[in-house]
Amino acid sequence: MRFFVSGMPGVGKTTLAKRIADEIRREGYKVGGIITQEIRTGPKRSGFRVIALDTGEIGRLAYVGQGYPRVGRYVVDIEGFDRVAIPAISRALRDADIIIIDEIGPMEFKSNEFLKALGLVLKSEKPLLATVHRKLVDRYRPLGRYYWLTPENRNEVFAEILMEIRKVLGRNENAGNKA
């Protein structure tokens, strides 16, 4: 089962992915993949980092500065991203009960290795929760269950995705810890 979540910037896509990861992990399942977080310098966003969900390893995805490749005002650090994201996704394919990819977006698409790894994830039978940049929605909507996240529906979407993931992993919503 694949779940794709999109929405406007700042609506809570990454927060939803982290909440799902934390809840599933608390229930005894192995969660793998990546989360992308903003880097802020004071009140201004100055870049993005990628974090491996299984190890906590951090790499730089993008920063404000000079260089290429670019997405808007950001320079994409393909090497920094690949150093963390590709092994994390590979480990998730091998070891995790569920794969989380936050985000499938224009910055990540600058990495050919990411595109290959994403292709393997999409071919696998492992449950997937992925956040998708709003400009790429049409490409991924047909591949699984799709949600457009808003401030009004984010708690409902969280509960629904969590319930469905529990079903896929052999749980019901009232299940206790896996032991």
Curated annotation (Swiss-Prot):
Keyword field contains Hydrolase: yes
Keywords in alphabetical order: ATP-binding, Hydrolase, Nucleotide-binding
Enzyme category, top tier: hydrolase
SUPFAM superfamilies: P-loop containing nucleoside triphosphate hydrolases (SSF52540)
Catalytic activity: a ribonucleoside 5'-triphosphate + H2O = a ribonucleoside 5'-diphosphate + phosphate + H(+)
The protein's Enzyme Commission number: 3.6.1.15
Amino acids binding ATP: 7-14, 98-105
A Pfam cross-reference name: NTPase_1
InterPro entries recorded: AAA+_ATPase, Nuc-triphosphatase_THEP1, P-loop_NTPase
One annotated GO molecular function: ATP binding
Domain of life: Archaea
Keyword match Nucleotide-binding: yes
Coiled coil ranges: none
Family: Belongs to the THEP1 NTPase family.
Cross-referenced PANTHER family: CANCER-RELATED NUCLEOSIDE-TRIPHOSPHATASE (PTHR43146:SF1)
Entry protein name: Nucleoside-triphosphatase THEP1
